[in-house]
């Protein structure tokens, strides 16, 4: 049997030579939701304001949400933030971004970020496949 590293929980998981792709999305969303609730429940004014600013920054404006999410995806990839990449991938997917558009944006991110972002590109591609599988 083979072992695969779960990119969400960084633990070994034994499977029958398959990665259960839908688990990638579910595990990410479950963990993110749980931890965001805890962070917000702590009632830290700065954290709450940052969350609020982030939400408002991605709202419809001169740029549509789809474009803003692609910008967030590129920036997150260049900054090598896997959780941020996953979040922007999922939101982009929900906004109707196509695989071709996502890959073009990720190509720009790889160009700007250099080869050090290639591992993040791989994980992003894997997460996108999981999103498509979950249709």
Regions found by a protein language model. Give the residues of each.
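Amphipathic C-terminal alpha-helical segment
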Residues: 81, 112-119
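Acidic, glycine/proline-rich low-complexity segments that act as flexible tails and inter-domain linkers
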Residues: 2-10, 14-67, 117-135
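Alpha-helical scaffold segments that form or flank carboxylate-/histidine-based iron centers
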Residues: 67-76, 105-112
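Iron-sulfur (Fe-S) cluster-binding segments and ferredoxin-like electron-carrier domains
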Residues: 88-99
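Short, thiol/selenol-centered motifs that function as redox-active sites or metal-ligating centers
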Residues: 71, 75-87
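Residues in soluble alpha-helical coiled-coils and helical-bundle/repeat scaffolds
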Residues: 58, 79-80, 97
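A general alpha-helix detector
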Residues: 53, 70, 87-88, 105
């Amino acid at each position: 049997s083979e072992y695969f590293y779960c990119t969400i929980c960084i633990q070994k998981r034994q499977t029958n030579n398959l990665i259960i792709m839908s688990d990638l999305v579910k595990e990410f969303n479950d963990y993110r939701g749980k931890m965001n609730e805890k962070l917000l429940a702590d009632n830290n004014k700065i954290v709450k304001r940052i969350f609020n600013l982030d939400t408002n920054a991605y709202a419809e404006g001169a740029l549509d949400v789809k474009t803003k999410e692609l910008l967030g995806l590129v920036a997150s990839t260049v900054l090598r933030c896997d959780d941020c990449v996953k979040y922007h991938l999922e939101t982009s997917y929900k906004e109707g971004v196509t695989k071709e558009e996502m890959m073009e944006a990720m190509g720009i991110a790889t160009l700007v970020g250099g080869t050090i972002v290639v591992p993040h590109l791989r994980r992003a591609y894997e997460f996108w496949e999981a999103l498509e599988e979950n249709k």
